[in-house]
Amino acid sequence: MTVRNIASICNMGTNASALEKDIGPEQFPINEHYFGLVNFGNTCYCNSVLQALYFCRPFRENVLAYKVQQKKKENLLTCLADLFHSIATQKKKVGVIPPKKFISRLRKENDLFDNYMQQDAHEFLNYLLNTVADILQEERKQEKQNGRLKNNGTAIATDTEPEQNKIDPTWVHEIFQGTLTNETRCLNCETVSSKDEDFLDLSVDVEQNTSITHCLRDFSNTETLCSEYKYYCEMCCSKQEAQKRMRVKKLPMILALHLKRFKYMEQLHRYTKLSYRVVFPLELRLFNTSGDAVNLDRMYDLVAVVVHCGSGPNRGHYITIVKSHGFWLLFDDDIVEKIDAQAIEEFYGLTSDISKNSESGYILFYQSRE
């Protein structure tokens, strides 16, 4: 255990008692726990995402429900379930937990994370959600195959076998998956073709002094395909000028928005951070939806923000702010603090292009209202 980890545990009592005092005994939510996570050497990218996901209630509830199922072989999901269960069943309301088992499993499963370097929180989120979904789908596939076997081990032939081989969406998809529709209109024959594409999170470009609504509008701006970028129209049987646009067709239960704050600079031969000020509201409604979108009036509430602190992707630090039972908390590895809602503005970014460290919202989690 490192000196930093020992110090984390030594400071646990001080931080915990201060947090309980800030929240107040009468206001402290029943059956809720606020636990920091020990940093095992530049694992703040992991800690910040885990805290955000823990406070996405539908995700937490499904992970905890997975924990109570029959004993399974260790994988990333079982380790995640053990960690969430450990937090949720603590006798104390606040404190610090070392996610050692989860980090060890993560490093075993993916070489990208098997080091002590700073990693990208968005890459980790993407990897985690896809891995959990893959594990669930593989388990369901095995269950279906086992269900088609007779007691003597021979397969039962059924007319519905192709249907049984079809992979159903998992609870990861039910929570985070939305659908984009890519519409292309030929400017010669006016034929519109569309192609759907599923997503677990949306990555949007950022500009200086804008808002999330502006970023999403830009994401869905109409683009003209001309010159060498002409579109091959099936109806015209030739390349034609066309207009292309992206719309949201299916709105997810939880919308994860990734702000593309790291840009490769050719002259520097490296990625640099765009610390632009991008306002993210506490409430969000999407306006870049397709005409046939389901629940197009869905209102979202901000529940968590992964914040990048520093000047570049491979240096700096990640923290998380979450909303829990009407108030806001800041998780900085082992430290947990209650913050005012007004303090969220500090994480919008910088109003000027001055090259200095900034604390900027990087991944936003919006949960839809019932």
UniProtKB/Swiss-Prot annotation:
UniProt KW NAD keyword: no
Keyword Hydrolase found: yes
Annotated InterPro entries: Papain-like_cys_pep_sf (IPR038765), Peptidase_C19 (IPR050164), Peptidase_C19_UCH (IPR001394), USP_CS (IPR018200), USP_dom (IPR028889)
GO molecular function (one): metal ion binding
GO cellular component assignments: cytosol; nucleus
E.C. designation(s): 3.4.19.12
Swiss-Prot/TrEMBL catalytic activity: Thiol-dependent hydrolysis of ester, thioester, amide, peptide and isopeptide bonds formed by the C-terminal Gly of ubiquitin (a 76-residue protein attached to proteins as an intracellular targeting signal)
Residue intervals of the USP domain: 35-369
Keywords, alphabetical: Behavior, Hydrolase, Metal-binding, Protease, Thiol protease, Ubl conjugation pathway, Zinc
GO biological process, one term: regulation of synaptic transmission, GABAergic
Entries under CDD domains matching the protein: Peptidase_C19G
First-tier enzyme category under EC: hydrolase
Family, similarity comment: Belongs to the peptidase C19 family. USP12/USP46 subfamily.
Subunit (UniProt): Interacts with WDR48.
Protein name in UniProt: Ubiquitin carboxyl-terminal hydrolase 46
Taxonomic classification: Eukaryota, Metazoa, Chordata, Craniata, Vertebrata
Gene name as annotated: usp46
